[in-house]
Amino acid sequence: MNRLRHLLALPLLALGLALSGTAGAAGPAADHVPHTAKPPFPQITLPEHAAHGQRAIDLLGSRLPEVANFYGKSADEFKGLLLRDRTHRLDKRGRLFIVEEMDKPLAATTATASTPGLLDGSLQPLDQTFLLHSRPGAKRTIYLNFKGATLTGTAWNSSGASLTALPFDLDGLPYSFNTTELQRIQYIWQRVAEDYAPFDVDVTTEAVPLDLINRSSSTDDVFGTTVLITNSTGVYSCSCGGVAYLGVFDDTSDFYKPALVFYNQLGAGNEKYVAEAISHEAGHNMGLSHDGTATANYYSGQGSGTTGWAPIMGVGYYQALVQWSKGEYTGANNLQDDYAVMQSYGLPLRTDDHGNTAATATLLTGSASGGISTL
């Protein structure tokens, strides 16, 4: 059973339990949480870029509690995060960004829509590849940019020079898209759109107007983020699958965007690997840290085959079912409720189309013929 089928089956199961009176006292999986205004970030200048661990703690010194407060954590919680996860780095302004370290690039593999755990939805006409929208008209947007960009005046331009981020490319011709590339982009978009389906957000491959991404003020309720899917060469020197700033989705500046995903490090553009990385990096923009254990920064999941599971903010490359989490596995070192945190950074849930109680749930109707009942 792939991820989409799991997601379709679970609401029906929950509804059946509620109607039968056996669901217990548990509430819905994700209650609505208000968008929380953040305190202003303290004015800090650090002597070096990308400090992590104890070095980052030492550099912040007496300013650490202020930075921790900005990220919604106590000083001790913030210290614990820096010490347990070396992928969390401080830039010279004291802002956190994450570098998804890997020992080496993931090996290239062949991924098709029939592979267990992959979406099996149909494709749109290929000339619509860069016009895909999951929820047009939503006030929040996640733009998946496969076409490349010139980065100027962003946090990634720490050297001051402009950066040329090349388009998604599988055939060595980066400024044109062949059939395989267009199909791959559509399947990647399907996967990411599925991950964000519970939210009132438009996941799109279309280059939308900047005012749908950039937030002009704290009263502007139309904003989003961009994930740029590019080659790491000439953009960011690392052996990593991506980089992203933490908790910048609702910033009133686009300085800390976009998030970057490096397809050339991810199985040479493997559909599943790239999609998982996109959802993961966008999650960092929305305030999420890694789901790991006491011995690993990333939890790679449990089980195997069609019943294998992993959290999106861990490592989802190798499991069929990959979901948002709040640390529902043995040895979890991060109990963030992903749904609650993302909402607090301005990503609202969709309005539920069916109630969560016996009084508000939709009545199941059916018919009977020849002794066989159908719903």
Predicted regions and their residues:
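Active-site-proximal segment of zinc-dependent metalloprotease catalytic domains
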Residues: P136-I142, K147, T154-A155, S159-A296
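Post-HExxH zinc-binding segment in Zn-dependent metallohydrolases
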Residues: G303-N334, Y339
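Ordered, small/hydrophobic-rich secondary-structure cores
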Residues: A30-A51, K272-S304
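Primarily auto-inhibitory N-terminal propeptides
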Residues: A25-L170
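Bacterial N-terminal signal peptides
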Residues: A9-S20
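Bacterial N-terminal signal peptides that target proteins for export
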Residues: M1-P11
